[in-house]
Amino acid sequence: MTEKKYIVALDQGTTSSRAVVMDHDANIISVSQREFEQIYPKPGWVEHDPMEIWATQSSTLVEVLAKADISSDQIAAIGITNQRETTIVWEKETGKPIYNAIVWQCRRTAEICEHLKRDGMEEYIRNNTGLVIDPYFSGTKVKWILDHVEGSRERARRGELLFGTVDTWLIWKMTQGRVHVTDYTNASRTMLFNIHSLDWDDKMLEVLDIPREMLPEVRRSSEVYGQTNIGGKGGTRIPISGIAGDQQAALFGQLCVKEGMAKNTYGTGCFMLMNTGEKAVKSENGLLTTIACGPTGEVNYALEGAVFMAGASIQWLRDEMKLINDAYDSEYFATKVQNTNGVYVVPAFTGLGAPYWDPYARGAIFGLTRGVNANHIIRATLESIAYQTRDVLEAMQADSGIRLHALRVDGGAVANNFLMQFQSDILGTRVERPEVREVTALGAAYLAGLAVGFWQNLDELQEKAVIEREFRPGIETTERNYRYAGWKKAVKRAMAWEEHDE
C-alpha cells in the first residue's frame, strides 16, 4: 500500500459539483459542494455553462482539501464521476467552448431523432450502441451544435475542435489540455460507440456527420489517464485514475459487480442498473444495454432504465407549485393522508424515459375530485417515483430472465422512509438502503484507488457494503396490482400530448 492516505472523488452532477475525500477504510473525511446555474433558453431546452462547471468543480477540490486539512501530497489518486450524455464542444487551441453544454435532459434534438427513426436506424442503433433513439444521448446533441455553430463542422474536420462528455472536459482542463480521453461507460452513452467492438462506430459518425477527429480516446474505467496539480500546494502531481458515468459509478460503489445484482439511484432522475456480467443482453422492453464496470474496472454489461423526473418532481412541488418549503417536508405531508384519494401524478415534464421513450408525453394529474388537497398531490408525486421504478424493473426482469430478490438504493431521496417503504410495497421486493449514502463518489474512489494499488482488490471493500435499513413489502398482491393498474392508465393518457399532426 502507498504511504499516501486519501482518495478524492470528483462528482460532477446535474445541479452541483462536489468533491469528496475518503480514507483507506472508505470513510468520508470531508465533502465540498457548489451549485451552478441551470439555463433554459426555450421550453424543453436545458444548458450549462462549461466554464462554470469547471470553476465550481475545481474550487470544490481546493475547498475539500482545506476542509480536511490535508495537503495534495497526501492524495493517492483522483477519481471522476459525472452526469452522463451532457455534451461539450470546445476549441483545442484555446480550451474555449463554442457553445454551452447541452444537458442530458434537453429535448431540442427530438426532430433529428425523428429523422433517424424515419431513416430506419432504430434497429442498427439498438444492436450496435445498445441504445434507443432519443434526444437524451450525446450523438444528436453534437450534431445539433455542428449544425448550428457556423463553420464548426469544417473546424472539427481540421482537428481544431474537440468533443467530450463532462468527464472528458474536466480531465482536459485538469491536465492543461494534455489528455483527451473518456472511459467505456461514458462512451457507451453517446450513441456513437459500438459496445461490442469497443470502438467509435463509423456508420453512426457518418449518419450524424460527426468528424472522428474531434472524439476522445476511450479507455478502461480504472487506469491512470494523466496527472494534475490542481488544488495542490507546491505542484504535487496527482494521478487521475478512475472515470465512470454517475450511474455506473453508483453500481460499482454499491459493489453490484456480479451478474443479476441491481441498484436504483434516486437523484434528479431515477436510474436502475442491473449487472449482466460479460453478456450484453439486448432489450425487447425499451431498456438500454450499456457498459458497466467489472470487479477490476474492466468491461461488464448492464441493463439500464432511466426515469427522467424523480427528485426533480419534488423540486417542482417546492419551486413552482409552492406546496412545500423544503424537499424533506414531502414525507411529513405525504403521511398526513392515508392515501392519494385516487390521484395519480405523471411527472412527464420532459417526456417519458424507459420503458416508454415518449419525448412527446407531458406532465399530468389524474383523478382529481373535490376532496383532493395538497397533501394528496404531494403523496401522489412521491408515489410516481416508485411507480416509474416498477415500470423499469418489470422490463428488466422480462429481458434478463432474472427475478430480483433485493434492490439496493442510493441517492438523495432514499432518506425519505415513506418513499422507500412504498417502493418495497409496490415492487413486492426487499429494498436495501446502505449506510454510506455517497455511493456514486465511492464508486469513483474505488476505481481510482484500485488503479494505483491504494486498494488491492474488491474483497478489501466488501465489508463497506453495510445495509443501514431493509424495507419489506407491507401490502397484499391484489392491492399492489390494483394501484399499479391505475398508474398504467394514467401514463397512457399522458403520452403523445405534444405530438404534432403530420
From Swiss-Prot:
Pfam families according to UniProt: FGGY_C (PF02782), FGGY_N (PF00370)
InterPro entries: ATPase_NBD, Carb_kinase_FGGY, Carb_kinase_FGGY_CS, FGGY_C, FGGY_N, Glycerol_kin
Signal peptide: none
Keyword line: Allosteric enzyme, ATP-binding, Glycerol metabolism, Kinase, Metal-binding, Nucleotide-binding, Transferase, Zinc
Alphabetized GO MF terms: ATP binding; glycerol kinase activity; metal ion binding
Activity: how regulated: Activity of this regulatory enzyme is affected by several metabolites. Allosterically and non-competitively inhibited by fructose 1,6-bisphosphate (FBP) and unphosphorylated phosphocarrier protein EIIA-Glc (III-Glc), an integral component of the bacterial phosphotransferase (PTS) system.
Binding site for ATP: T14, T15, S16, T268, G311, Q315, G412
EC number: 2.7.1.30
Reaction equations catalysed: glycerol + ATP = sn-glycerol 3-phosphate + ADP + H(+)
Stated family: Belongs to the FGGY kinase family.
Protein purpose: Key enzyme in the regulation of glycerol uptake and metabolism. Catalyzes the phosphorylation of glycerol to yield sn-glycerol 3-phosphate.
Assembly and interaction partners: Homotetramer and homodimer (in equilibrium). Heterodimer with EIIA-Glc. Binds 1 zinc ion per glycerol kinase EIIA-Glc dimer. The zinc ion is important for dimerization.
NCBIfam families the UniProt entry points to: glycerol_kin, PRK00047.1
Protein name, as recorded: Glycerol kinase
Source lineage: Bacteria, Pseudomonadati, Pseudomonadota, Gammaproteobacteria, Enterobacterales
Gene (name only): glpK
